[in-house]
Amino acid sequence: MIRHMIPKRICSIDFALIGPKEIRSLSTSKVITADTYDDDGFPIPMGLMDMHLGVIEPGLRCKTCSRKLDECPGHFGHIDFAMPVIHSGYSKVIKDVLSSTCSGCSRLLLPQERIDHYTSLLEKIHESEAGTTVTMQEHIRRAIREAVKAKTCPHCTEAQIKLTLDKPTTFREEGRKLTPKEVRSRLEKIPAGDLRTLGFNPETTRPEYMVLTVLPVPPVSVRPSITLESGERSEDDLTHKLVDVLRINQRLRENRDAGAPQLIVEDLWELLQYHVTTYFDNQTAGIPTARHRSGRPLKTIIQRLKGKEGRFRSNLSGKRVNFSARTVITPDPYLSINQVGVPEMAARELTVPVRTNIHNLQFMKWLMKENFDPSDPERYIPGINYMIRPD
């Protein structure tokens, strides 16, 4: 019966990188000012606490959904970068893509018949139910290893220069540093057919998305400010980091538009790259840790997710719920193979909610009558901890 009610059945899920157009379409406000509140204590429009991003003050209504604090989930905004910056989480992927494509024509450094061979292999694995992500990745890695060995491009015969990655986000060709703008330009020119061989689905994901031109700004509910006893506001670590990003981004735009010397523009560009990198991960190897004035390291996005105290292990896997306990399983030679031993204290304390009906009424009455007697702990009888009457 239920099977006929379901119009469609999900058979697979594709994960994709979010592109700049989609970030802007999901955004409810463009953030351009680093200031948060005005003199009267109200959020500044187009600032990091703009009321279009949600509200955290009781009584105020969100300007996007018109809901109050406890009903509004929050909404994303966005920051437009003056110059592109590299997402440090994808540096190795960018290196693989650049190393296996031509620096001149941006074609994959494999003859066309080899490209067709790998493409057909990946398509067969994708269509086959027996195919797995692991086998696809093996073929993709094999194609990349084969392409990296090429000394000249088989399509335009241009000689290839070895690319190196200075962690976390600096790419060099024979000592010359590639700017994020050059990296993005080369990634944009890679044809869709070659991208499939590299494991990309060009209909949903392009490699240039790994070089950011737009940064999503998380809702206010994700980074709420707190009011101290003195009456002053203390902003969240993510808000502090976004303030740094906005200020440097504004200075970079002003200097670039004013025709400042290239050295000054490059220094500000590197500083923007640093702030964006530490915004994602404040423990990135090879760069200094961003800190408060007190010296405490900022807790940015990756630090909120990973590790024992992170969102997954602490708040999702290890959350506290009713009718459950965690205890050591007791070994016992008298237990059946399909049984586990549980300490008596946990067994008596934990309750299983049972709805009384005509089929179990007599059994429930017996449980109430023969309930556990603390004066006779040797006589174990399952009991009832409490009863909820319908009236």
Label every model-predicted segment:
Residues 1-391:
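Conserved core architecture of multi-subunit DNA-directed RNA polymerases
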